[in-house]
Amino acid sequence: MLSNTNLNSFRSLIYRSGWLYNAVTRRLYDQDTKFFTIASIIGTGPKRILDLPCGTGYLMRFLHPDIEYEGVDLNHRFLKRIKAKELRKRNIKLKRIIIQRKNIFDFQNYMGEKKDVIVLCDILHHVYPKHIDLINIAKKIANKIISCEPYVVKPTEISARDKLFKIIIFLGKYLPKSLFKIVDFLFLDNDGINTYHQRSRWNLDQKTLKQFYKTMGFTNIQKIMDEYIAICEY
């Protein structure tokens, strides 16, 4: 998601398949409850929503039909799945749907009429140390920001919902750092955009993530498993 990025950089296995990404994240996190909660906070339409980044478009499954939705991501495979599976197979009907492949930091493309809501879901820890920049620009172009962020991002610390993944995570705790970096590069959180060095510097835990949200003006902070959903509005 960062500027001056090679869009064709190598991505890990789960970032090369929208289906696999959904399958894995649903076993690690309570995805349905998370996105249902975000959609409930957004409420009914008519409203203009900007999803940064949109990932596989999971949020659209739960949005009210009167919502105008704009999703932005750099992962062309995820966007392809949205158009081929989410919109057609699931027959998602929203008032308006715009899906674009572009850098979420291309702020000039978001200027003009304010959005009602910007959703920043599972992105801040990926763009560190530019996470504050992303929030600050979002404040200028939206009336409300909904952020969802895990306070546990290291795979060895995640409380997986699936028994198989619990075993995998347990075994992962004993991998040396050099080997874990290879596993991350090939199979885990390597999005092909943000380096392991950048992502691994994110160190906010349950207490400090909540404090960070408060410092940035977020309120109504609620916990869902290993994640916080927070709201900032004016």
Whereabouts are the PLM-identified features?
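N-terminal, positively charged/glycine-rich alpha-helical extensions of SAM-dependent methyltransferases
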Residues: M1-W19
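Class I SAM-dependent methyltransferase Rossmann-like catalytic core
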Residues: L13-D32
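Conserved alpha-helix/loop element of class I SAM-dependent methyltransferases that forms part
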Residues: L28-G45
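Class I SAM-dependent methyltransferase "Motif I" SAM/SAH-binding loop
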Residues: P53-G55
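Class I SAM-dependent methyltransferase SAM/SAH-binding core
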Residues: G57-Y58, F62-I97, R101-D106
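A conserved beta-strand element that flanks and buttresses the S-adenosyl-L-methionine
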Residues: V119
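A short, conserved alpha-helix within the catalytic core of class I
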Residues: V127-A138
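C-terminal alpha-helical "lid/dimerization" subdomain adjacent to the S-adenosyl-L-methionine
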Residues: C148-F212, I221
